[in-house]
């Protein structure tokens, strides 16, 4: 598939997604060994967990924060390819699709030491989400 056609599909998917996600943010109930984060948008409220993944780096536990945003259903192989290609272009962002015809998710992963989970970390997540949204808006 040509890059031009690929970008056309990606733009269509992104525009649909942006219309649905008028507002979203990341916040935590309580920082700690395990905390819950939420993503809110116009259609959907999802819960995700922040879990110690048992990796120890320099004597410190690590965490992975994943932010998932609901995407329109993937209708074809071309849709899926467009989404995966977008993921390659966005640093730190992964697009996950189980199979064609099944909803995908846009995920942002931030890794760092658990004891540094703070408002600054959540603010950084919000900045990355804003960058991703701006990228889609520019397509």
Go through each PLM region and give its residues.
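Conserved short hydrophobic interaction patches
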Residues: 17-20, 83-90, 125-139
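A signal for specific C-terminal beta-sheet/loop modules enriched in small/flexible residues
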Residues: 50-68, 120-132
